[in-house]
Structure formats: C-alpha cells, structure tokens
Swiss-Prot record:
UniProt main location, coarse: cytoplasm
Group of enzyme by EC: transferase
GO MF annotations in UniProt: kinase activity; protein-N(PI)-phosphohistidine-sugar phosphotransferase activity
Protein name, UniProt field: Probable phosphotransferase enzyme IIB component M6_Spy0801
Protein's organism: Streptococcus pyogenes serotype M6 (strain ATCC BAA-946 / MGAS10394)
Length: 163
C-alpha cells in the first residue's frame, strides 16, 4: 500500500529520508523517476541518502506503476517519491486506491524558464505543464492532494492553491 506520493524535485534528502519515512512508518522508499532509473551515478547518490535499515527501489515511472499494481505490494508500506507533478499525476491515474499526494517541493531546481513559473508557495514554482498536471491531479476523485513540506507544517489542499 502506498502511504503517500511526495513530489519533491530533490528526490531523496534529509527531510524525506529521515523525517517523512518515520512519520509515515514506511520502510520501503520507491523513487519513481525515468532519469534516475537510467543513471547509475544518480542511483548511487540516492542510495547514500537513505538511512540504514530502509529499502530503496529506483524505477522508471512505468515500472513503478507495474510494481504498485502488483498484488504482492498491497501488504507493504511504500513511500513514493517523484520529482514532478506530471509523474505523480501519471501514477495517480493508473494506481487504484491511492489516497494521498503531497506536492511539496517543485520548480526550484528544474531547468525551465523562471519567468514562465507561477509561485504557488515558496516551495512550489509551477511552469505551465506542471500547473496543468496539478489541476488534473486535484480533479481526480477521492484523492487527497496537498502541500506540506514537513509534518509539522499545516497541510494545505492543493485545490485551494491552483484553482
């Protein structure tokens, strides 16, 4: 079972590896990212950021969807990290019973034109493609889509920010 999908353009870092995995009680972290799945240096870097005792899988978005829909995954607590709203939306549309997507940190490190981005919050800078994906994501039924950088922060529903 997926405990949460977190959209964070930094993928695995201290907030994710230590704070959120503990908060969500998720011993399995899946990075669903096409580029990371193909890049051995990125994979080594991500593995170094994960605490001992935690399992990390790095898969393409397509392979991640297959993994999440495998019946053997239903009894596991899985925390999923993607680096774009577009990827979170692709997973949310294909994986039934997904409950929560945390659009936490987006747009500060991508290579898109800063002038094209809308500053939704200090941690969310969405280009037109990501904004369209965010609007599609919040329109999906029975899915809690929110922005919460840290567990101690107030959860803000994304529909209040992008509509």
């Amino acid at each position: 079972m997926i405990t949460q999908i977190r959209v964070d353009d930094r993928l695995v870092h201290g907030q994710v590896a230590v704070v959120w995995t503990k908060e969500l009680n998720a011993p399995l972290l899946v990075v669903a990212n096409d580029e990371a799945a193909k890049n051995e240096i990125t994979q080594m870097t991500l593995k170094m950021a994960v605490p001992n005792g935690m399992k990390l899988l790095i898969r393409s978005v397509e392979d991640s969807i297959k993994l999440f829909n495998d019946p053997r995954a239903t009894d596991k607590r899985i925390f999923v990290i993607v680096n774009s709203v577009k990827d979170a939306c692709a997973i949310a549309k294909e994986v039934p019973d997904l409950e929560a997507v945390n659009v936490a940190n987006v747009g500060r490190f991508d290579k898109s034109d800063p002038a094209s981005k809308v500053k939704v919050t200090p941690s969310l800078l969405l280009n037109p493609e990501e904004m369209a994906a965010a609007k599609e994501l919040v329109s999906l039924p029975e899915l809690d889509v929110f922005n919460q950088v840290l567990p101690s922060n107030t959860k803000v529903h994304l529909s209040q920010l992008v509509n």
